[in-house]
């Protein structure tokens, strides 16, 4: 399989590699951009919290496993917003520099922005973001192409403003839901679903 071709081993430190097997080197601003874009792609169906994906967000044991499968946390909303503000301030000071990111990350970034601009409802946006996120994960599961794209800093600063407004709107919704107090976690329940089996025979 792909992971063995690239030399990945369970007991080793496995660095991110390109499709040719070379270790991919990055920098802090690129990592922060990756975090921001991925977290925005994890907004819940109401665009309030950041989805937990069955993890233990904030070390809250009550949200282990199933409760957090469709759950989200407001604490990460605040952290992502703070990161957006920080990166915006830095990029504004160094707007004459250039930033390159892996083409897979840039594709996710473009799809996130397009989804925010075109989706008419919260659920539609959630579905579009989830689809973009899963496509990105499939492409980067074991490696990336190694090709990079140069980002336009003013355009990304504009995107950060959009993300900040989206997160702020989520805080307002959460405060309304909590009668003036901001809830910490949300749990969503699937009311309609289809069971998909990988093995058609059971």
Protein language model features and the residues they cover:
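Acidic, mature catalytic/reactive cores of soluble proteins
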Residues: 1-202
